[in-house]
Amino acid sequence: MLSLRRGLITKSYLNYKFVNHLAVIPRNYSNDSKYFFSKPPANDNNDKGSYADSKHFFTKPNGKMNSNEQIDQMHNNGSNNPNNNKNGSTDSLIGQAILQQRRERRKQVWYALGISIFAVLIGYSIGYKVIYLNEDSFIPLYPSSGIRKPSQNDLRKIDVPHIKLISHLRVLEVLSHHDMIKEQYGVPLHDSNGVNPPQIKEFNIWCEDQDPCVTGLIIRKDDPNRPTTHTWHRIPYLLQWRVTHRPICISRSISNFLEDIGLSYSTIYEIISPEKIYGSFKYEYPIPGDDHSMHIWFLGELQLNNDTLIIYKGKYHVDVKLQQVDLLRNEDGKLVRYVLFKENE
């Protein structure tokens, strides 16, 4: 019944006098998205301007590179000058503005990251460790030189006259057993004034850190009555601080980390191999406080006569140990050096 009704409707529609034939007419759609559902007018140049497609709103539809490609090219060339692409072009100006905005954004990110790290460091080192836990806090600043002059605190712990005396005796012993000195200068030795033995003309000492060190600030809570051997700067009723050196010891850092998590291997390690931690002396005590391992070097001079000078160098650790002894002599207007003694030779 439904099929019969559809057939009658179709037949009556085709017999209508205004309907001559049926045909499918293709529509000519424009590339412009605003005419996606409608037919553009015959003349729309005034509305569209010179850019027919909306995807070319910032670029020209002439097959040239777009703004992103220009920005990448400008970035690779390392220049902000828009004349590299096209002088005075709008695309270059837009690309330059976007590139400048990206750089400013990167700078802001780095500034924010640096300020955040600084705030966390100060908050943890001063606010938490010093004020809350009442502990000393060390803030590293820059790497320090391994060779330096001994401080006043170091000189209080080093017996310089004893080092000078022992080194003098060791040098005289080396010279007295050397064949060249025996033949040319005689034994016992005398200086140009006939003094026996020749006296030390100059003697210097310096310190050399055993491990790499960093210079930084050590900060603690203000306590004027706290005993100390160092000179501290104060922020009254708040903090005390001073500049110091700290070694970078990987094994000690690992040991401290293990102790923090409840593990420890130092006792067993000391029993098995004590020289690895405390040196070659079995009963040597560990270094207390904020002191660290260092070598004490010395350099001295002995004047045998007006043309001969003895220079010796060595290291002090519990006992004096000579490294090298040289003889400098003026021969025919030339300065000649003779190596009289060198360690392991």
Swiss-Prot record:
Residues 64-75 have a biased composition (Polar residues). One of its GO terms (cellular component) is mitochondrial membrane. Residues 76-89 have a biased composition (Low complexity). The keyword Membrane applies. Belongs to the AIM39 family. This is Altered inheritance of mitochondria protein 39, mitochondrial. Residues 1-29 form a transit peptide. The chain crosses the membrane at residues 113-133. It is found in: Mitochondrion membrane. It is a single-pass membrane protein. Keywords: Membrane, Mitochondrion, Transit peptide, Transmembrane, Transmembrane helix. The keyword Protein biosynthesis does not apply. Residues 46-91 are annotated as: Disordered. Its main location: mitochondrion.
